[in-house]
Curated annotation (Swiss-Prot):
It is found in: Cell membrane. The gene is atpE. Keywords: ATP synthesis, Cell membrane, CF(0), Hydrogen ion transport, Ion transport, Lipid-binding, Membrane, Transmembrane, Transmembrane helix, Transport. This is ATP synthase subunit c. F(1)F(0) ATP synthase produces ATP from ADP in the presence of a proton or sodium gradient. F-type ATPases consist of two structural domains, F(1) containing the extramembraneous catalytic core and F(0) containing the membrane proton channel, linked together by a central stalk and a peripheral stalk. During catalysis, ATP synthesis in the catalytic domain of F(1) is coupled via a rotary mechanism of the central stalk subunits to proton translocation. Key component of the F(0) channel; it plays a direct role in translocation across the membrane. A homomeric c-ring of between 10-14 subunits forms the central stalk rotor element with the F(1) delta and epsilon subunits.
Length: 70
């Protein structure tokens, strides 16, 4: 049962991160199209935000290992 729970958690976090990254990139392109002079600042903020979005699957992987080893 723990394996199923870990698999569901991993799938959910991967789907959520994929959707989040897609929305983030769409808004970045939209923002650069509006104000091209802010491209450097927007790209920096995008990388920081993408790191925060990608942190969730990494945390879930660690939690899944704990769940499987119980």
């Amino acid at each position: 049962m723990n394996y199923i729970a870990a698999g569901i958690a991993l799938c959910g976090s991967a789907i959520g991160a994929g959707i989040g990254n897609g929305m983030l990139m769409a808004k970045l392109i939209e923002s650069i199209a509006r104000q091209p002079e802010l491209e450097g600042n927007l790209r920096t903020n995008m990388f920081i935000s993408m790191a925060l979005v990608e942190a969730m699957p990494i945390i879930v992987i660690a939690m899944s290992f704990v769940l499987i080893n119980e």
